[in-house]
From Swiss-Prot:
One of its GO terms (cellular component) is cell periphery. Expressed in fetal periderm, hair follicles and in the thickened epidermis of the lip and footpad. Also present in the epithelia of various tissues such as the penis, vagina, forestomach, tongue and esophagus. It comes from the Eukaryota. Residues 27-129 are annotated as: 13 X 8 AA approximate tandem repeats. The keyword Cytoplasm applies. The gene is Sprr1a. Belongs to the cornifin (SPRR) family. Keywords: Cytoplasm, Keratinization, Repeat. GO terms for biological process: keratinization. Cross-linked envelope protein of keratinocytes. It is a keratinocyte protein that first appears in the cell cytosol, but ultimately becomes cross-linked to membrane proteins by transglutaminase. All that results in the formation of an insoluble envelope beneath the plasma membrane. May participate widely in the construction of cell envelopes in cornifying epithelia characterized by either increased thickness or a requirement for extreme flexibility. Signal peptide: none annotated. This is Cornifin-A. Residues 1-41 are annotated as: Disordered.
């Protein structure tokens, strides 16, 4: 009987201790954490906002605008315009004009005309006899 009584009181205290330990631990960390993070955060962005945009805005546009257009505009158009059209115009038309029309004109019509009619005429009349009758009449009339 005495052993049973000792076990009962032993099981009860550990349950009470666990509950008491969990309850006091949860509330204390939330209370001190919430006010500490908010307090130091609010004053930090206030002094940053006015200091950042004030010195940045006037410094960036002032030196950038006058420096970029002044040296870029006169340097780019002056040396580019005279150098590009002068050497390009005389070099391109001179060697291209005589080479393209001379060798292309005689070569294209000569081999094309005799090759096209020769193999085409005998192939068409063989399978189609009806087309043979009108084709020779047209050729004879043209020759006369």
């Amino acid at each position: 009987m005495s052993s049973h009584q000792q076990k009962q009181p032993c099981t009860v205290p550990p349950q009470l201790h666990q509950q008491q330990v969990k309850q006091p631990c949860q509330p204390p960390p939330q209370e001190p954490c919430a006010p500490k993070t908010k307090d130091p955060c609010h004053p930090v962005p206030e002094p940053c906002n006015p200091k950042g945009p004030e010195p940045c805005h006037p410094k960036a546009p002032e030196p950038c605008h006058p420096k970029a257009p002044e040296p870029c505009n006169p340097k780019v158009p002056e040396p580019c315009q005279p150098k590009v059209p002068e050497p390009c115009q005389p070099k391109v038309p001179e060697p291209c004009n005589p080479k393209v029309p001379e060798p292309c004109q005689p070569k294209a019509p000569e081999p094309c005309h005799p090759k096209a009619p020769e193999p085409c005429h005998p192939v068409v009349p063989e399978p189609c006899p009806s087309t043979v009758t009108p084709s020779p009449y047209q050729q004879k009339t043209k020759q006369k």
